[in-house]
């Protein structure tokens, strides 16, 4: 039996200048992201949704600062016996409604996540049964060994089941709509911030919850205005004029450079994601592995890194060694940095059964992410050196997500910035490369490879961290050989910020978190006088 205690909570609590009393007016924090802002935590999948989840709701476990480990959060401890995970809940937690947290809330939250089958519900496919042992104890029984289960719980928001049940909408069965209509516009969490108003296309307004069980930073903002869909030029002007505080992560490099030069601070997160150039392995000429290898070798990785450099010390990316960011379980060592090799590219092309002059490659880029157009241009220039013609196509995100559902509609090349939602390699790789997963924006490669499937399944079943690392290293090597993807760079997410606040998890590596977006938890913000 393994037992994980609450002592690790001290690390997290230590990041906060605890305040159980209402603080003096600490002002308004203004932030933006790409729409839409999905408020229902069971449907959260994108950046804006996740940011709302981490601020409005809490989870059983949470990442530890300066570490890749996990600590109890709403739980005070847990034990593991085979496929059975038992969590003891903290006694002092209350939802924003005033209702106490109980095991029934955890059961409801898991069953709701599974019933809606949306967001990151794929993380809980192996959960066979969730039961309240007593008011403060909840037990999960899995149908099969699943090593990333506890990491997945960082994305299971615990909702106030009593409040939701009082607000069920139309639908079939006992739980009707499971409160979807209500939770799309209201919060039912225990988090440090409560929703005041919500328009998923325009703005979410949140107010601090001074009854939060862990306390907030002494000068945490009283109000957060979270806006959606601001243009880069607008954000630049607003920050420069002192009218905005934190940008989205999608500002073009030159805007970030300009803001930094004008005195804005740059906030960073790294270690959990990457930028991928994904090849449709079902569409000629990319159905030939040697063609894919040729294009991978022809890509100018160093030019890509130069394109995203912001200052002498900050860039949007770091050199990649493979599919997993350097430092993640199973990643390859930094000295194996991927580099352009035109001699190897020509050798691979000579072994390809297709002739480059017979094809025009469709190089897509997402309309809402201007940086991707530059990488499309870089690919076009690189691939032309091998004799490939190409067409650059701008695709709105909504249309792109529709197209990639079917291999025949998927472009030759798709671009994706993504992160491991839980910090675990399974969360990054399974949805991208396992052949059992339907085509989504994560998997426009449409790869089918028995060895890849086998390694992904082994990684899920193996509980020993060292052996899991070996499995994911082998998977990394296999994917480098198959070349379904050009691993452009390991991602470093950069936000521009005003100088009106400090946010240690985004500026001090010793206080950073191993889960994307968690560092933007508003309770860690200290507004300046």
Residue spans for each PLM region:
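Gly/Pro-rich hinge or "lid" segments in bacterial periplasmic/extracellular proteins
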Residues: 64-65, 157-216, 223, 342-343, ...
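Surface-exposed binding/hinge segments that line
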Residues: 79, 122-171
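Periplasmic-binding protein-like
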Residues: 282, 286-327, 374-375, 479-484
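Structural transition elements
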Residues: 315-352, 367-374
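Long beta-strand-rich cores associated with HINT superfamily self-processing modules
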Residues: 495-529
């Amino acid at each position: 039996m393994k037992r994980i205690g609450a002592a690790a909570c001290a690390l997290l609590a230590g990041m906060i200048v605890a305040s159980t009393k209402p603080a003096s007016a600490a002002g308004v924090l203004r932030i933006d992201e790409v729409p839409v802002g999905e408020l229902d935590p069971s449907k959260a999948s994108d950046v804006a949704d996740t940011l709302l989840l981490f601020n409005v709701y809490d989870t059983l476990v949470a990442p530890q600062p300066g570490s890749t480990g996990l600590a109890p959060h709403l739980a005070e401890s847990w034990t593991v016996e085979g496929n059975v995970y038992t969590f003891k809940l903290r006694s002092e937690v209350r939802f924003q409604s005033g209702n106490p947290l109980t095991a029934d809330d955890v059961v409801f939250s898991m069953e709701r996540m599974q019933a809606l089958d949306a967001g990151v519900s794929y993380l809980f496919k192996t959960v066979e049964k969730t039961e309240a042992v007593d008011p403060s104890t909840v037990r999960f029984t899995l149908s099969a060994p699943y090593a990333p289960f506890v990491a997945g719980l960082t994305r299971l928001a615990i909702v106030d089941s009593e409040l939701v049940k009082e607000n069920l909408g139309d639908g079939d069965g006992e739980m009707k709509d499971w409160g979807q209509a209500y939770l799309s516009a209201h919060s039912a969490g225990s988090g440090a911030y409560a929703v005041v108003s919500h328009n998923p296309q325009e703005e979410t307004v949140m107010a601090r919850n001074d009854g939060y069980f862990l306390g907030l930073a002494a000068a945490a903002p009283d109000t957060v205005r979270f806006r959606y869909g601001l243009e880069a030029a607008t954000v630049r002007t607003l920050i420069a004029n002192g009218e905005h505080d934190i940008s989205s992560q999608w500002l073009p490099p030159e805007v970030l450079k300009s803001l930094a030069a004008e005195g804005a601070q740059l906030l960073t997160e790294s270690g959990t994601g990457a930028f991928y150039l994904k090849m449709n392995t079902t569409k000629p000429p990319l159905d030939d592995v040697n063609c894919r290898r040729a294009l991978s070798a022809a890509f100018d990785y160093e030019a890509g890194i130069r394109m995203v450099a912001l200052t002498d010390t900050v860039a949007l990316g770091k050199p990649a060694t493979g599919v997993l960011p350097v430092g993640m379980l199973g990643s390859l060592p930094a000295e194996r940095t991927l580099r352009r090799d035109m001699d190897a590219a020509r050798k691979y092309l000579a072994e390809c059964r297709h002739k480059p002059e017979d094809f025009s490659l469709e190089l897509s880029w997402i309309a809402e992410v201007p940086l991707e157009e530059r990488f499309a241009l870089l690919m076009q220039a690189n691939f032309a050196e091998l004799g490939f013609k190409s067409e650059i196509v701008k695709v709105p995100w909504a249309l792109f997500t529709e197209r990639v559902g079917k291999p025949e509609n998927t472009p030759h090349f798709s671009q994706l910035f993504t992160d491991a939602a839980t910090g675990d390699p399974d969360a990054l790789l399974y949805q991208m490369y396992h052949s059992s997963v339907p085509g989504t924006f994560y998997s426009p490669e449409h790869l089918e490879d028995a060895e890849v499937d086998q390694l992904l399944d082994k990684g899920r079943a193996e509980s020993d961290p060292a052996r899991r690392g070996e499995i994911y290293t082998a998977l990394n090597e296999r994917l480098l050989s198959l070349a379904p993807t050009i691993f452009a760079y390991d991602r470093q997410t950069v936000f521009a910020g005003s100088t009106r606040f400090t946010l240690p998890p985004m500026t001090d590596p010793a206080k950073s978190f191993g889960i994307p977006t968690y560092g933007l938890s508003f309770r860690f913000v200290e507004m300046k006088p």
